[in-house]
Amino acid sequence: MDNTKEKDNFKDDLLLRMGLNDNKAGMEGLDKEKINKIIMEATKGSRFYGNELKKEKQVNQRIENMMQQKAQITSQQLRKAQLQVDKFAMELERNRNLNNTIVHVDMDAFYAAVEMRDNPELKDKPIAVGSMSMLATSNYHARRFGVRAAMPGFIAKRLCPQLIIVPPNFDKYRAVSKEVKEILAEYDPNFMAMSLDEAYLNITQHLQERQDWPEDKRRYFIKMGNYLKIDTPRQEANELTEYERSISPLLFEDSPPDLQPQGSPFQLNSEEQNNPQIAQNSVVFGTSAEEVVKEIRFRIEQKTTLTASAGIAPNTMLAKVCSDKNKPNGQYQILPSRSAVMDFIKDLPIRKVSGIGKVTEKMLMALGIVTCTELYQQRALLSLLFSETSWHYFLHIALGLGSTDLARDGERKSMSVERTFSEISKTEEQYSLCQELCAELAHDLQKEGLKGRTVTIKLKNVNFEVKTRASTVPAAISTAEEIFAIAKELLRTEVNVGSPHPLRLRLMGVRMSTFSSEDDRKHQQRSIIGFLQAGNQALSSTGDSLDKTDKTELAKPLEMSHKKSFFDKKRSERISNCQDTSRCKTAGQQALQILEPSQALKKLSESFETSENSNDCQTFICPVCFREQEGVSLEAFNEHVDECLDGPSTSENSKISCYSHASSADIGQKEDVHPSIPLCEKRGHENGEITLVDGVDLTGTEDRSLKAARMDTLENNRSKEECPDIPDKSCPISLENETISTLSRQDSVQPCTDEVVTGRALVCPVCNLEQETSDLTLFNIHVDICLNKGIIQELRNSEGNSVKQPKESSRSTDRLQKASGRTKRPGTKTKSSTLKKTKPRDPRHTLDGFFK
């Protein structure tokens, strides 16, 4: 007896799950028992039936667990939960918002209506759009037989043998939907479209503006015949009765026959008014929310010849329910007051609310909850049996609360495409379908400008078992080829798992998620080009920041200083110092105000670098002088590098003197120490000869730019005029002839192939000195020499010792002995000086000139 009762209960539950859901417009008053019997007979024994049985058992198990949990709840727990829920309900009541007017517009049987419009023969026949596998929608004639959306076509044929199933044409549906949305945008530019046939609008602002509109702006004319709409308003041509003015001629079935139009609404000009062939009438809409919605529906019907239903309420949840209240071709409004809202909610079935499906409905029915009033009465129990998100949503429904913000919640998290089809078991067809889905997904991603890293495939086999497989890649992707490469591997894995049995699918989908954000892009690996661009940006940003005295602007380059390289920061400081100097010469007192922030900037950047340094003693090689610094801390090494970088521009004379004394000490103080060379003599030495010193001292010479190399003759003449006692001499370079000839050939070809950079100073990345040239070829040669100056120095030293010089006058001998002393490497004791050849008058560039 008990087993029979259990079977009957299970059968009833299965009917509730698989039977007809009549909570849809146009399906009231049907013989559900007869319809459910046909549905059960058509599905029994099928895979779908078996899958529904399995799901029903799972739901029954959930209900059993819930009832066991309910039995263990004590009265004390229930009272505590009651206080908690009531407190939350009071908070919700305080935040209730009744100031917005939300409208939900829903087209009536949209797909079917478009097909009937384009094919008038289908107008009075039961039709559905879809296939024998699944229906997308049905018209109201078919709904009287129990045919509805989301029903297999073969079952619908059992319910209505004369049903006509029309294949869908989504391009046509999208075109009509675009026309409807153009009308909706005039009332709320920020309306939220939920699908092709429904949308939410907030007309609160429109209602405020509408109060001041004249009657002509709210008048729409109905014109018989195929004429276009003209924007110029006018007075109505014929007098209408009060009843005719109060209704929309196309919205209601009881409209007078003479007001049924065949064309579109328009506003006449004076010429068309006098045309006797034009029969016209007009409708003036009011300023209330209900009148606005009538106007919207009127315009939609006039433009598309399709009808729409609408709901008007203080929030989206109620507006959605109201739009289904008077379907088709109707509207319903809930006044913006708490009493009106609660009166509407009081007897509303819970299944009518969007978000409560058949599973939730069955679980609530097990607790004796059918209406929203009962939902509120059991609020404490629901808080103990359901998750926090669920019972919060239930309480919102029971109080008639919903969203008033039409903006979507947060950013898009994923994007997907999927397709249902008849059984596919061939691997080639599955790969081909997967490639089509990937191409469609890539197109959607590119339209939105999105890239993602996680690709997921969804597979449903013929037994209605759903599997999802995902793979995440390091870099964001968006192209069809990249997506398909990952999806194909995931699909191949599933094919191999079931081998040798084929993978029999009836649904496939591809999803992209983990979209890359701006923050993710900032942490990508830097390239060489990006590094060079960052250096150029650092120079420009430093120059711009010095033009502003605001402390907040000066702090911006400091925030980025830790991201620059060491040489970038030094180069920026050098340019800023040059800019400060030029401003002092031209702007006077104003330059002082700019100089102080630049000094503060330099001090702050130096202190920032010092704070990051470690005190551990290590061995470093100076990137400027290439000397090895042993047993020094990083801070001391940085100070050494600063001295090397700042040396040529700040303390050159003292360094030359220091080098002179140091070289004298290296030979055991056997020669007299001569005073430092005067400025005129120094210029002669720098332009007419290269003083050979240690490899470090090569960076101490003042003029190492390419200007000296390109203007050797001019500088030599200038030296002679200033100091006639300095002979015109050049340092011998006894390198191989091939090297010299190569340089000469390069020099001769340069005028034809050089690239010139204008508007930007070239700074050598090795010696960190600004080169006064715009010739990139000469600049590259200078950089090559700086990089290989160690090898060049060794060659010069080895060749210089083998050349002998004749003795000159006493004054010249003393000077040459001093130069020879600096030329000798440590440990050499010979006092013989090298003979210096006279510099040729040929203006070609030499290695000696480039080295300067």
Curated annotation (Swiss-Prot):
Zinc finger (UBZ4-type): 619-649, 761-791
Record note on what altering residue 692 to S does: In strain: C3H/He
Entry binding sites for Mg(2+): 106, 197
Polar residues bias (residue ranges): 261-273
Region (Disordered): 252-273, 798-852
Free-text comment on the cofactor: Divalent metal cations. Prefers Mg(2+), but can also use Mn(2+).
GO molecular function, one term: DNA-directed DNA polymerase activity
One GO term of the biological process aspect: cellular response to UV
EC number of this enzyme: 2.7.7.7
Entry's Gene Ontology cellular component terms: nuclear body; nucleus; site of DNA damage
Domain called UmuC: residue spans: 102-357
Keyword Cell inner membrane in annotation: no
Impact reported for residue 710 to S: In strain: C3H/He
Subcellular location: Nucleus
Compositional bias annotation for Basic residues: 821-839
InterPro entries tied to this protein: DNA/RNA_pol_sf (IPR043502), DNA_pol_Y-fam_lit_finger_sf (IPR036775), DNA_pol_Y-fam_little_finger (IPR017961), DNA_polymerase-Y (IPR050116), DNApol_IV (IPR022880), Rad18_UBZ4 (IPR006642), Rev_trsase/Diguanyl_cyclase (IPR043128), UmuC (IPR001126)
Binding residue positions for Zn(2+) 1: 622, 625, 640, 644
Reactions catalysed, as given in the entry: DNA(n) + a 2'-deoxyribonucleoside 5'-triphosphate = DNA(n+1) + diphosphate
EC main group: transferase
Keywords: DNA damage, DNA repair, DNA replication, DNA synthesis, DNA-binding, DNA-directed DNA polymerase, Magnesium, Metal-binding, Mutator protein, Nucleotidyltransferase, Nucleus, Repeat, Schiff base, Transferase, Zinc, Zinc-finger
Notes concerning its domains: The catalytic core consists of fingers, palm and thumb subdomains, but the fingers and thumb subdomains are much smaller than in high-fidelity polymerases; residues from five sequence motifs of the Y-family cluster around an active site cleft that can accommodate DNA and nucleotide substrates with relaxed geometric constraints, with consequently higher rates of misincorporation and low processivity.
Record function comment: DNA polymerase specifically involved in DNA repair. Plays an important role in translesion synthesis, where the normal high-fidelity DNA polymerases cannot proceed and DNA synthesis stalls. Depending on the context, it inserts the correct base, but causes frequent base transitions, transversions and frameshifts. Lacks 3'-5' proofreading exonuclease activity. Forms a Schiff base with 5'-deoxyribose phosphate at abasic sites, but does not have lyase activity.
Assembly and interaction partners: Interacts with PCNA. Interacts with REV1.
Family stated for the protein in its record: Belongs to the DNA polymerase type-Y family.
Entry protein name: DNA polymerase kappa
Organism: Mus musculus (Mouse)
Gene assigned in the entry: Polk
